[in-house]
From Swiss-Prot:
Keyword annotations of the record: Ribonucleoprotein, Ribosomal protein
Coiled-coil portions: none
Matching InterPro entries: Ribosomal_bL35, Ribosomal_bL35-like, Ribosomal_bL35_CS, Ribosomal_bL35_sf
Organism for this UniProt entry: Paracidovorax citrulli (strain AAC00-1)
Annotated GO MF terms: structural constituent of ribosome
The protein, known as: Large ribosomal subunit protein bL35
HAMAP family recorded: Ribosomal_bL35 (MF_00514)
Gene that encodes the chain: rpmI
Amino acid sequence: MPKMKTKSSAKKRFRVRPGGTVKRGQAFKRHILTKKTTKNKRHLRGAVSVHETNMGHMAQMLPFAGL
């Protein structure tokens, strides 16, 4: 059986919270911000949790996270 490896891209983008949920950053806030409203950029500022339907993919990408 091959070694289990953590996806390097996933370990840079996600953090596992103590309750077992996964924290992620919002998309659409890196560039082309001049055409976005201040309200839109403000709503994109905070971190959100990964949806429960995607938690299976998270467990595959982060096998040692205990998901």
